[in-house]
């Protein structure tokens, strides 16, 4: 088996732990990232954590639309979340037990034209035998009003994460971009 691009003759050549795995430019409702299980860059088993950075907007009508994650095709109520949000006028919080996690809100088609939301999902300890935890930060502009959103979530499964489905409320608008990064264990001083 050949070494991934960031390893040369068995030595980690990149001093940083971040590895770009894949970038999608969706114009549909969902984006799936699936582990290649081949020892190469796309093989999730080599990473400690995963990070998804999204710059996106929904094509669906409304000021705000949701963006969520599901792991390993699990559509059951095996997720938990604590959310905090604010818009400069009011703040709120909620606890949920949904069929997905990583909730954030992105600008919908009723928002100011050409304004996209930023969303960062940090998914921790993806190959451990523990329940998987994650954090989400997002912010976006809307006509009803601008909002910042944070979530701490749990996937109640001990399985290693081998697939991540990024789901939008509606469809992603043209120009949206979703990038997946793997975080390697530190192997250099």
Regions found by a protein language model. Give the residues of each.
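Surface-exposed molecular-recognition determinants
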Residues: 2-189
């Amino acid at each position: 088996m050949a070494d991934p691009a960031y390893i040369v003759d068995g030595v980690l050549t990149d001093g940083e732990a971040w590895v770009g795995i894949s970038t999608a430019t969706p114009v549909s409702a969902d984006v799936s990232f699936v582990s290649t299980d081949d020892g190469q860059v796309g093989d999730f088993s080599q990473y400690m954590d995963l990070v998804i950075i999204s710059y996106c907007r929904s094509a669906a009508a409304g000021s705000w639309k949701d963006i969520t994650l599901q792991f390993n095709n699990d559509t059951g109520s095996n997720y938990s979340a604590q959310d905090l949000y604010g818009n400069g006028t009011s703040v709120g919080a909620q606890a949920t037990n949904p069929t997905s996690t990583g909730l954030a809100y992105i600008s919908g088609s009723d928002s100011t034209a050409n304004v996209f939301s930023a969303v960062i999902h940090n998914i921790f300890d993806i190959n451990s035998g523990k329940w998987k935890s994650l954090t989400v930060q997002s912010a976006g502009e809307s006509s009803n009003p601008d909002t910042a959103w944070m979530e701490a979530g749990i996937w109640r499964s001990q399985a290693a994460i081998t697939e991540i489905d990024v789901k939008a409320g509606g469809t992603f608008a043209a120009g949206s971009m979703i990038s997946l990064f793997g975080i390697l264990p530190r192997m250099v001083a």
